Design a protein with these regions (language model features):
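MFS-fold secondary transporters
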Residues: 94-98, 110, 114, 185
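Residue-level signature of mid-helix packing/kink "hotspots" within the transmembrane helices
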Residues: 33, 61-69, 119, 151-153
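Extracytoplasmic
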Residues: 16-50, 71
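Transmembrane alpha-helical segments of major facilitator superfamily
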Residues: 55-64, 147
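Interfacial helix-cap and linker-helix signal at transmembrane-aqueous boundaries
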Residues: 42-43, 74-75, 160-165
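Conserved MFS/SLC helix-loop-helix module at the cytosolic interface between two early adjacent transmembrane helices
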Residues: 66-105
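Cytoplasmic helix-loop-helix junction between adjacent transmembrane helices
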Residues: 110-147
Length: 191
């Protein structure tokens, strides 16, 4: 994107980048916090101790926090768009794998992968910063930051899905939604 002048980009293109990136971040944040809801049932199903449960819930948060450094570097090197899509697809894969994790160790490993979705924050910032000049970056990034509402999405919708279909369905639906949004993001955004 460095080869073109940012001032020549249409406002519509900027708004499209902002809205799709914010929606993608919302979905990633929803996935990142999935254990806050399904974790209680997993604890019961697997007979986890309080310590094991705490570690399970904290694992994706730790991964998402630590991976941001690398994802930020890669977003600078390769562009935010391909890295964001890779984060969404890999997070979707690990979220889907949750339904097959039948041991605590497998659940922890998939939780590590689910945590990649937490790194989407820095990728979106790197991507959107290139679309807006300095005078408009604060507003754009503030709107993007509203994607944290994904945690509320999980806390509001996941219990209904869990009651109706079980915690496995939550993982499946969140994974499918992430794949669909990754494709939409890729098709309708530009580098």
């Amino acid at each position: 994107m460095a080869w073109w002048n940012r001032t020549m980009v249409s406002t519509q293109t900027q708004k499209s980048a902002l809205s799709l990136t914010t929606i993608a971040f919302t979905a990633c944040f929803a996935v990142w916090t999935i254990f806050a809801i399904i974790g209680v049932q997993i604890k019961e199903d697997m007979g986890l101790s309080d310590t094991q449960f705490s570690l399970l819930i904290g694992t994706p948060i730790l991964t998402g926090s630590l991976v941001r450094l690398f994802l930020g570097i890669w977003a600078d090197q390769y562009g935010g768009r391909p890295i964001f899509m890779a984060v969404m697809l890999s997070s979707a894969f690990f979220t889907w794998c949750l339904i097959y994790a039948d041991t605590y160790m497998l659940m922890l490993l998939t939780a590590l992968g689910v945590g990649l979705s937490g790194g989407s924050f820095v990728v979106g910032i790197a991507y959107l910063s290139k679309w807006y000049d300095k005078e408009h970056q604060g507003t754009a990034l503030g709107i993007y930051g509203m994607g944290n509402i994904g945690a509320a999405v999980t806390k509001f919708i996941a219990p209904f899905v869990m009651v109706a279909y079980g915690w496995h369905a939550v993982a499946q639906i969140w994974a499918i939604a992430l794949v669909v949004l990754a494709v939409v993001f890729w098709v309708f955004t530009k580098d």
